[in-house]
Regions:
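Short Gly/charged-rich anion-binding patches and loops
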Residues: 7, 33, 79
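Divalent metal-dependent catalytic cores for phosphoryl transfer on phosphate-bearing substrates
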Residues: 37-154
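Residues that form generic nucleotide/phosphate-binding pockets
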Residues: 11-15, 83, 95, 155, ...
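Active-site flanking loop/helix segments enriched in acidic
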Residues: 9-32, 57-61, 67
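Extended, non-globular alpha-helical segments
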Residues: 1-11
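Metal-dependent nucleotide-binding catalytic modules
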Residues: 6, 25, 122-187
Length: 187
């Protein structure tokens, strides 16, 4: 059930040109913009890999169209984890797993954040459990990798610009390779 690096590249090449639902970019453009923003901010390879892969779960289901418009939470932040676990460690996987909760956290703690979300992101927020209450926000904040998940979330929110210039997918494969677990390298 795991993917190899060539499988991941192939998935982006075959399914990445699908529209990122409710946004003016494709899935691949969104992934590349997220990784580019992480790289520009000096993130390490594990977090750049997380930024590239955080929405891979959207490419691994067959719901079709825009799941949020169908009232569905596609659980993309969890859907991709079994496919990536053999390759990457927690420094990559945990920010992916937590990036949806990071949105819920920021809505609770940062004035104006909720209102600044795109329409589809606001719709998905409700399907994903809504804004954290104070106790949930505090519990999230205490988690390992919560800060990285918040950084990823901010790049995710920003990486929706039509016609933005980024390096191509091949450029980011080196970050994927650098983020591999030692056991994945040996395999």
């Amino acid at each position: 059930m795991s993917l190899s690096l060539p499988d991941i590249v192939g998935l982006f090449e075959t399914k990445g040109h699908a529209q990122y639902d409710g946004e003016p970019v494709t899935q691949l453009e969104h992934a590349l913009q997220s990784a580019h923003l992480a790289e520009q901010e000096g993130a390490d390879s594990a977090l750049i890999a997380a930024s590239l892969l955080h929405d891979l779960g959207h490419l691994l289901h067959d719901f079709g169209g825009t799941p949020t418009q169908q009232g569905l939470d596609d659980l993309h932040q969890y859907r991709c984890l079994p496919f990536l676990r053999a390759l990457f460690g927690p420094a990559t996987l945990e920010p992916i797993r937590l990036h949806v909760d990071a949105k819920r956290f920021l809505c609770a703690r940062e004035p104006g954040y909720l209102e600044a979300l795109s329409r589809d992101s606001q719709r998905s927020l409700q399907l994903q459990g809504g804004v954290f209450d104070s106790a949930q926000a505090s519990a999230f904040e205490a988690l390992p990798y919560a800060k990285d998940a918040v950084r990823l979330r901010r790049w995710d929110d920003t990486a929706k610009c039509a016609d933005a210039k980024t390096p191509d997918l091949a450029h980011y494969v080196r970050h994927l390779e650098a983020a591999l677990k030692p056991t994945a390298i040996a395999a």
